[in-house]
Amino acid sequence: MAAATWSWLLAPFLLLHWASAGAGGGAGGSGAGLSGPAVFTSSFLVRFRRGVDNSFAHDVADKYGFDNLGPLVGADGHEYHFKHRTLPHARSRRSLTHTRALKSHPAVHTAVQQPGFKRVKRGLRPAVPAIHGMKFDLKVGEGNRIDEEPTDPYFPMQWYLKNTGQNGGKVRLDLNVQAAWAQGITGKNVTTAIMDDGVDYMHPDLKFNYNAEASYDFSSNDPFPYPRYTDDWFNSHGTRCAGEVAAARDNGICGVGVAYDSKIAGIRMLDQPYMTDLIEANSMGHEPHKIHIYSASWGPTDDGKTVDGPRNATMRAIVQGVNEGRNGLGNIYVWASGDGGEEDDCNCDGYAASMWTISINSAINDGQNAHYDESCSSTLASTFSNGAKDPNTGVATTDLYGKCTTTHSGTSAAAPEAAGVFALALEANPQLTWRDIQHLTVLTSKRNSLFDAKNRFHWTMNGVGLEFNHLFGFGVLDAGAMVTLSKQWHSVPPRYHCEAGELTQPQAIVMGRSLFWEIKTDACKGTDTEVNYLEHVQAVISANASRRGDLELFLTSPMGTKSMILSRRANDDDHRDGFTKWPFMTTHSWGEYPQGTWKLEARFNSPQTRHGNLLEWSLVLHGTKEAPYRTLHPSSPHSKLAIVKKAHEDKKMK
């Protein structure tokens, strides 16, 4: 496994530096998603000496036996994706002949053959798929009122929309969507892109909510992201996710989507032998002004030993999306936190652990975590996956061949539910920024009845009174509460990135003892990047160990909030690469004051003797200079908003 290396989340100037450096060779490291030797695809990144139009790039591609698949997002016409017509999709050696041919053109600055890597769908697959034919309801066409329950035949099985205790579930442990629907909010004028293995846009429960203009197939390079049918139904994943968001209401077919009047776009990008940086980048930057939300139920391999994340072009596309998408309000990227269970940590997944994405975990219908849930300090909130008592009490949604299923599961099922809730919030207030959505998530998510089945992680209160859990983030999404608060929301103040300090003198981590490092900071006080109220915190760390999986890391804020930023991963037997500038992220100090002493603790958790070194640590604080909720008026003195706002006001008076 290559070294786990990323600096991509540090600060805008680093991202700009990488953007200028281009997207050719990966993010400096990991390849951890690959098994075995390196793989090279038939895709090439071609960087021109000047910005060129698509016609010019097409002529260059054609001259050397390539197809031009178009410009890269954010490259201003300097970079294009070429695919060779005869090279195999994957080979173990670079094709130097084709690289040299491209570089021989006087307008080409460089050409880089793209490495391939694995990305996996996050969803359990039942041994026998529970696929059902369509069921039609006698009430179709009666014009049901919005305050009545949906008549869709699978709605009674959609316990995550309305939990009445079905199959041993906890009554009212659900997304509280009916409270949003009752306000007339159903997702109108919002489009969610399902980045997956395709969407069956001819499904009768989806076809009227399908946004063809915002859809594309990056696996086959055409505008028709239809799934490739296989005998094992594996390519049903995207269609199932789409139904969770926007399945139509009261049409007698399957169930109903969380935001049933919203639109879905299909972005087919998972169905090829190997992923490339260019496919990911173009998917995440596709039609950013037509698409509001991108939902991703996939990521690096959840094997408990992979450390991997987005490469350069992909990271650039995400950053451009949050900065420029939706006409400057920012696209919302929703990510499934991972299905590696207690043997994995989603802070080792650079997609889920990114501050630009919203990482969503899952709970089952009685409130406990699913056995496949990963824990990490970067998870912001949770929704729901399969039920506890009955393996068939999964998520009821659309499936291939115009059919329905009740067995969709994994954190794959959780992310689209969150996307649907965010679509409701965006209808309620179309001016919400990507950061507003994150703040609303923190303030309106509920602890409810969520608990850790193995009693490892308890609910803890941070320094400004916000409860969080290492598994569930700030709780389960509450659609009704989010819509209500969205209507009165005022956008949060500008966000700043403060490089708060660094330690670069290596020190040994001794078995049986914790190593403590401290950084005292004024959080850039008096500068243009002053941070007084936290959002995300990153500990950018380099370390090595005789067995990386036995290393644990903790970060404690000046207000005393302790985040486990890396837990033990029993399957990770790496002893060579360790971590190189890996940005471990925590949301647990949200709203806190960053001034003071931050403590990093490193220790081994193993019955065997281990040794290693903490090589360097940089602390990066992200947040606002001004109090984020100063213009809002809480509806209840017991709400999270009221609690945090009072904490901020009390601090200001001292």
UniProtKB/Swiss-Prot annotation:
Domain of life: Eukaryota
Tissue and organ expression note: Expressed in the central nervous system (CNS) and midgut endocrine cells of third instar larva (at protein level). In the CNS, expressed in the CA-LP1 and CA-LP2 neurons which innervate the corpus allatum, and in the CC-MS2 neurons which innervate the corpora cardiaca of the ring gland. Also expressed in the CC-MS1, SP3, Tv and Va neurons. Expressed in Akh-producing cells of the corpora cardiaca. In the embryo, restricted to the final stages of embryogenesis where expression is found in anterior sensory structures and in only 168 cells in the brain and ventral nerve cord.
Glycan-bearing residues: N189, N312, N544
Cellular location(s): Secreted
Residue stretch(es) of the prosequence: 22-121
Record annotation: effect of changing C254Y: In amonC254Y: Partial embryonic lethality and defective larval growth with no pupariation or survival to adulthood
Location of the P/Homo B domain: 491-627
Keyword Glycoprotein: yes
Keywords linked to the UniProt accession: Cleavage on pair of basic residues, Disulfide bond, Glycoprotein, Hydrolase, Protease, Secreted, Serine protease, Signal, Zymogen
EC number: 3.4.21.94
Stretch forming the signal peptide: 1-21
Consequences of knocking out this gene: RNAi-mediated knockdown in Akh-producing cells of the corpora cardiaca results in a significant decrease in combined glucose and trehalose levels. RNAi-mediated knockdown results in defective muscle patterning. RNAi-mediated knockdown results in a reduction in the pale ommatidia subtype.
Catalytic activity: Release of protein hormones and neuropeptides from their precursors, generally by hydrolysis of -Lys-Arg-|- bonds
Disulphide bridges, residue numbers: C254-C404, C346-C376, C498-C524
GO cellular component entries: extracellular region; extracellular space; membrane; neuron projection
UniProt GO MF annotations: peptidase activity; serine hydrolase activity; serine-type endopeptidase activity
Biological processes per GO annotation: carbohydrate homeostasis; hatching behavior; instar larval or pupal development; larval wandering behavior; peptide hormone processing; proteolysis; R8 cell fate specification
Class of this enzyme: hydrolase
Active-site feature positions: D196, H237, S412
The keyword Hydrolase belongs to this UniProt entry's keyword annotation: yes
Domain (Peptidase S8): residue spans on this chain: 158-483
Role this protein plays: Serine endopeptidase which is involved in the processing of hormone and other protein precursors at sites comprised of pairs of basic amino acid residues. Required during embryonic and larval development, probably by proteolytically processing peptide hormones involved in hatching, larval growth and larval molting. Required for the processing and activation of Akh which maintains normal hemolymph sugar levels.
Family per similarity comment: Belongs to the peptidase S8 family. Furin subfamily.
Name of the molecule in the record: Neuroendocrine convertase 2
Source organism of the structure: Drosophila melanogaster (Fruit fly)
Gene this chain is encoded by: amon
